[in-house]
């Protein structure tokens, strides 16, 4: 399942082979979905796209609320959509926002780590620039029970 209907043909062509979804495509999917963000308080739209091992991609955006604690980030939206559809094996996460490159917040880092401790993360911007890292680099001392 892909969060943006324009990518349906890509999903069908590439399902089962996540290697065929390159970094630029995943970043573009994250960037394209940014327009759906609900961010009237920060005016800071963020988009995310998470690639599953079977080639399925889930997208997410930040959704704000007047009570900030009830807001959710794009990264967690994408992960929770995937998990709610039965996907648990994640390969790569792309996140985009305006500025130099977009970094996941601390809460997102913990959620990402718990669901995919080996995941690669692409932190990008609308101009196509990005930084490649891993969740272990971003959160070397993750909390665990």
Predicted regions and their residues:
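Short Gly/Pro-enriched turn/cap motifs at secondary-structure boundaries
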Residues: 38-41
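Amphipathic coiled-coil signal-relay and dimerization helices
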Residues: 58-60
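C-terminal binding/interaction regions
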Residues: 2-36, 85-145
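Compact, glycine-rich, soluble single-domain proteins
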Residues: 62-77
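Feature captures the catalytic cores and cofactor-binding loops of soluble hydro-lyases/lyases
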Residues: 77, 81-85
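Short beta-strand scaffold segments in enzyme catalytic cores
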Residues: 43-52
